[in-house]
């Protein structure tokens, strides 16, 4: 978006039976906004991840995709080794801000926990 523009609506196509997505958020509600958040979208066919999209907020100056963690997942069966590697790739790619709401290490840790939980969720991996 350009300065002065705002997002009015978002439309999503219907998920296929092979697709799963989730969004996790950590917030300090006294202040009214999220400290960090993670969106995950996977396509899994025959037990392997054929497509992964991971986006974070609070992991850098702006919301961002984490392509290094996506690359760990794509082409792999999501098991313990792959989850640990994807979380490590995500944390290495982040440059979170440090401010009065949360420091950088806290945000980096929290986003890694969010990815770990999302990848282990039965709703995500059915």
Predicted regions: what they are:
Residues 1-126:
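C-terminal structural segment of proteins
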């Amino acid at each position: 978006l350009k300065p002065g523009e705002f997002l009015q609506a978002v439309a999503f196509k219907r998920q296929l039976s092979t697709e799963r997505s989730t969004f996790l958020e950590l917030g300090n509600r006294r202040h009214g906004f999220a400290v960090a958040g993670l969106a995950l979208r996977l396509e899994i066919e025959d037990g392997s991840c054929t497509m992964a999209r991971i986006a974070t907020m609070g992991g850098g100056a702006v919301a961002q995709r984490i392509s290094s963690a996506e690359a760990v997942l794509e082409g792999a069966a999501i098991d313990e080794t792959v989850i640990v590697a994807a979380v490590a790739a995500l944390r290495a790619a982040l440059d979170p801000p440090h401010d009065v709401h949360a420091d950088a290490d806290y945000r980096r840790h929290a986003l890694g926990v969010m990815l770990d939980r999302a990848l282990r969720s039965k709703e995500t991996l059915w």
